[in-house]
Amino acid sequence: MSQRKLQQDIDKLLKKVKEGIEDFDDIYEKFQSTDPSNSSHREKLESDLKREIKKLQKHRDQIKTWLSKEDVKDKQSVLMTNRRLIENGMERFKSVEKLMKTKQFSKEALTNPDIIKDPKELKKRDQVLFIHDCLDELQKQLEQYEAQENEEQTERHEFHIANLENILKKLQNNEMDPEPVEEFQDDIKYYVENNDDPDFIEYDTIYEDMGCEIQPSSSNNEAPKEGNNQTSLSSIRSSKKQERSPKKKAPQRDVSISDRATTPIAPGVESASQSISSTPTPVSTDTPLHTVKDDSIKFDNSTLGTPTTHVSMKKKESENDSEQQLNFPPDRTDEIRKTIQHDVETNAAFQNPLFNDELKYWLDSKRYLMQPLQEMSPKMVSQLESSLLNCPDSLDADSPCLYTKPLSLPHPTSIFFPNEPIRFVYPYDVPLNLTNNENDTDNKFGKDSKAKSKKDDDIYSRTSLARIFMKFDLDTLFFIFYHYQGSYEQFLAARELFKNRNWLFNKVDRCWYYKEIEKLPPGMGKSEEESWRYFDYKKSWLARRCGNDFVYNEEDFEKL
């Protein structure tokens, strides 16, 4: 009889807990939707919440008493579930109580961005966090599709990423309400989670229905298209395929002799072209000599006499005897002798009596090595082919030659082979932008500072490694800084971010900050507006906009 009565008491209590939680949720929703300026109504709702939570706390104490006994094993899971629901309501009431005790413009309210009283701001924050999570997941999937060379999935992801970034920017700039994003949240989430399923059906016009569809190629500042100007996902894919195909098969522009005579060539590239042109190599007349791209001259591999052309012409030896003659360079004994004689007469080192005999003996001993071989074994051909094809792509290939003039270089050398040590220090009289003019360098690396004088220049900016760091993007620099702690490379990455990219390092939270200055249209009261961004290296690995509560304190930032 007592067991039956206990079961009846448990059922009655669980019914009261269910009703109490429903009443608590209704009051809590009213509190969240109430205007923060209506303090009297919010205080009344707070007292109602307090009354309901006290009832639930009594029920929780009774549930804890029953759980300590062994007579309720069949109801133990149900009692634990209701206990957790009551404790969840207690936590929510604590947050409401803390929110009501916090004054609007107190130090705690200004320094804590999580304390948001405006319901619209709460919705906006939730949607911004949702889009951030979707972008992070899509970026991970995009990297996988790019590694698998899946062009169709890559194009779809690029389209969605571009539109989500546009929505995120509009939300942050208050150009878009969070309600449309909340309405289509399930559709966006469905694509992010199920886009690789075989039965997946894509919602092509989701961003068009939201009124903010853009093309991936357009910038974030572009206004959303309206009416007939809006394009579907299928048309964007077809246009992107048409854009990609000519990029892969773009014809190289021929440069005539007159164009080459008037085109300024960097000293490093000019010396490389002279050394290559001095070596007789088979050149096809139908192939353009070199292509002009990005203000630098790159040589076409098909025009150089490589072991590949040597092997292919050896295969045609029986068909055409005239082609066989191209494989063997002419006798250059006289040319080498004249070069050595010229070096002996012009260089001051050969006139020194202390080194005169030794240098002449050294040149005579190297004479045989400087003469190209008339014939080459197949094994040597294969070794040269593999070595040239696997030659490292040096990032300092455009470094200027600091010697006056080399001795004869009869054998062809890859133009991408490094001609300077990796940490070679340049003298002050050699400018750092020999191969690129000042405007191109500023545009390429995003610099807005003027060229520094020799006194302001330091030794680190004159090393090849520092010049390499100038070519890295922000993701690479941040990766080196956070993952190569205590190394020389970390110092160079920090120096590049601070001096050339204008980022500031905060010693307190160990984050990098960047100040943006946006010019406002006339009539706004002020000409420009400042905003701060920080690099989130802990969660998203993205540069995010700082909140309105961010205060710049110069003492917290490191100075290099």
Curated annotation (Swiss-Prot):
List residues modified as Phosphoserine: S377
Start and end residues of each stretch annotated as Disordered: 212-330
Check the record and name the InterPro entries matching this protein: CCR4-NOT_su2/3/5_C_sf, CCR4-NOT_su3/5, Not2/3/5, NOT2/3/5_C, Not_N
Q: Where is the composition biased (Low complexity)?
A: 273-288
Where, per the database record, does this protein carry Phosphothreonine? T306
Q: Does the keyword Coiled coil apply?
A: yes
Ranges of compositional bias, category Polar residues? 215-237, 299-311
Which GO annotations describe the biological process of this protein?
deadenylation-dependent decapping of nuclear-transcribed mRNA; deadenylation-independent decapping of nuclear-transcribed mRNA; nuclear-transcribed mRNA poly(A) tail shortening; positive regulation of transcription elongation by RNA polymerase II; protein ubiquitination; transcription elongation by RNA polymerase II
Subunit structure, interactors included: Forms a NOT protein complex that comprises NOT1, NOT2, NOT3, NOT4 and NOT5. Subunit of the 1.0 MDa CCR4-NOT core complex that contains CCR4, CAF1, NOT1, NOT2, NOT3, NOT4, NOT5, CAF40 and CAF130. In the complex interacts with NOT1 and NOT2. The core complex probably is part of a less characterized 1.9 MDa CCR4-NOT complex.
The task this protein performs is described as: Acts as a component of the CCR4-NOT core complex, which in the nucleus seems to be a general transcription factor, and in the cytoplasm the major mRNA deadenylase involved in mRNA turnover. The NOT protein subcomplex negatively regulates the basal and activated transcription of many genes. Preferentially affects TC-type TATA element-dependent transcription. Could directly or indirectly inhibit component(s) of the general transcription machinery.
Q: Which PANTHER family match?
A: CCR4 NOT-RELATED (PTHR23326)
> What family is reported?
Belongs to the CNOT2/3/5 family.
Q: What else is known?
A: Present with 5110 molecules/cell in log phase SD medium.
Name by which UniProt lists this protein? General negative regulator of transcription subunit 5
Task: Please name the source species.
Answer: Saccharomyces cerevisiae (strain ATCC 204508 / S288c) (Baker's yeast)
